From Swiss-Prot:
The keyword Ribonucleoprotein appears for this protein: no
Entries under Pfam families matching the protein: PALP
One term of GO molecular function: tryptophan synthase activity
Modified residues annotated as N6-(pyridoxal phosphate)lysine in this record: 91
Protein name as it appears in the record: Tryptophan synthase beta chain
InterPro entries: Trp_synth_b_CS, Trp_synth_beta, Trp_synth_beta/beta-like, TrpB-like_PALP, TrpB-like_PALP_sf
Catalytic activity entry: (1S,2R)-1-C-(indol-3-yl)glycerol 3-phosphate + L-serine = D-glyceraldehyde 3-phosphate + L-tryptophan + H2O
Assembly description: Tetramer of two alpha and two beta chains.
Function noted in UniProt: The beta subunit is responsible for the synthesis of L-tryptophan from indole and L-serine.
Pathway: Amino-acid biosynthesis; L-tryptophan biosynthesis; L-tryptophan from chorismate: step 5/5
Class of this enzyme: lyase
Organism: Bacillus cereus (strain Q1)
Known EC number: 4.2.1.20
Length: 397
């Protein structure tokens, strides 16, 4: 398969690109230049690997979920344990890389958006480590849902700005963070939290997250002497999935499955299934599939999980859907909750609600596969942050 994206203008087929105001164009070009240089600099790579190993705690285990495998009665189920990273999710793979890049570029301050708070915590964490000032924008609704993470960010020295505009969720936080970046561009680096935004962000985030798929490949081959037959990951903006899928894109014998949030159901207005129900448009500087009405107004995304309710999806996922290399599906709130409880009870591992969407789809897929086949789930984060809202949800039901 001949797959080499993005092209030199930052396009993934028709997707991606750089739809930014003049005021930002210089900064994204400067960032692209700095990123290219850093990737070719052995010292930078050495420093990044040092922090990934000694600070983040990589590599993360590839765990054979024996009880889940028996329960499903099909493929061997493996979990890539991104929940065991420092700060409890895959997000820090990207924030540590971008923060080192910010230091290299001579920036003193970092701005970021956050939904579930995981990216905010991971950003505040690396800013504390590297002595950078940190401002985090978070939607009002998410601030309410994720009080603990807000306190965590403040403990780490970050300033958390609550965004009341729009629906008070991730999309609105990104808007405000971009606005802030425009007016502080001389001394501030924007750490985008997913494979979104204008080029080179989708590529930078994908490349820093690819450590997930690269490790998985190596670990699975060491255990089974071959590649897995299937790989499953959840998708909001799509960074854990892109990090898991990208190293496998050329291995066509490996089936790749991306799992979106169907919320209350894709037939309702309350979902975040962008690739299932969306159409092409431009948001936050990039062309991608979006949830929008006929007038092109962005619709509200809904999911029980704060990390999946983004109304767009990364440009590379948009392309991978069109060319059929990744097959995209969606899982409802209820199915994700059921999978959350099942994994917790069967394996003693409490997954994030985001990751529970991937687990739920894997539970449908595994029984259809042969016993000598392997299925890897990207367990993108731990569920500590969700326990309170799950308790509330279950009491209401």
């Amino acid at each position: 398969m001949n797959y080499a994206y993005p092209d030199e203008k930052g396009h993934y087929g028709i997707y991606g690109g750089r739809y930014v105001p003049e005021t930002l164009m210089q900064s994204v070009l400067e960032l692209e230049e700095a990123y290219k240089e850093a990737m070719e600099d052995e010292e930078f790579q050495k420093e990044l690997n040092h922090y990934l190993k000694t600070y983040v705690g990589r590599e993360t285990p590839l765990y054979f979920a024996e009880n889940m495998t028996k329960y499903c009665g099909g493929a061997k189920i493996y979990l890539k344990r991104e929940d065991l990273n420092h700060t409890g999710a895959h997000k820090i793979n990207n924030t540590i890389g971008q923060a080192l890049l910010a230091v290299r570029m001579g920036k003193k301050k970092v701005v970021a958006e956050t939904g579930a708070g995981q990216h905010g915590v991971a950003t505040a964490t690396v800013c504390a480590l590297l002595g950078l000032e940190c401002v985090i924008f978070m939607g009002e609704e998410d601030v309410r849902r994720q009080k603990l993470n807000v306190f965590r960010m403040e403990l780490l020295g970050a300033k958390v700005e609550s965004v009341a505009a729009g629906s008070g969720t991730l999309k609105d936080a990104v808007n405000e963070a971009l606005r802030y970046w425009v007016s502080h561009v001389h001394d501030t680096h924007y750490i985008m939290g997913s494979v979104l935004g204008p080029h080179p962000f989708p590529q930078i985030v994908r490349d820093f997250q690819s450590v997930i798929g690269n490790e998985t490949k190596k670990q699975y081959e060491a255990l089974e002497g071959k590649l897995p037959e299937a790989v499953v990951a959840c998708i909001g903006g799509g960074s854990n999935a892109m990090g898991m899928f990208y190293p496998f894109v050329h291995d066509e014998e490996v089936a790749l499955y991306g799992v979106e949030a169907a919320g209350k159901g894709v037939h309702t207005e309350k979902h975040a299934a962008t690739l299932t129900k969306g159409s092409v448009g431009v948001l936050h500087g990039s062309m991608m599939y979006l949830l929008q009405n006929e007038e092109g107004q962005i619709q509200e995304a809904h999911s029980i999980s704060a990390g999946l309710d983004y109304p767009g999806v990364g440009p590379e996922h948009s392309l991978l859907k069109d060319i059929g290399r990744v097959s995209y599906h969606s899982i409802t709130d209820d199915e994700a909750l059921e999978a959350f409880q099942l994994l917790t009870k069967k394996e003693g591992i409490i997954p994030a609600l985001e990751s529970s969407h991937a687990v739920a789809y894997a539970l449908k897929l595994a029984p259809q596969m042969k016993k000598d086949e392997g299925l890897v789930i990207c367990l993108s984060g731990r569920g500590d942050k969700d326990v309170e809202s799950i308790k509330r949800y279950m009491e209401e039901v």
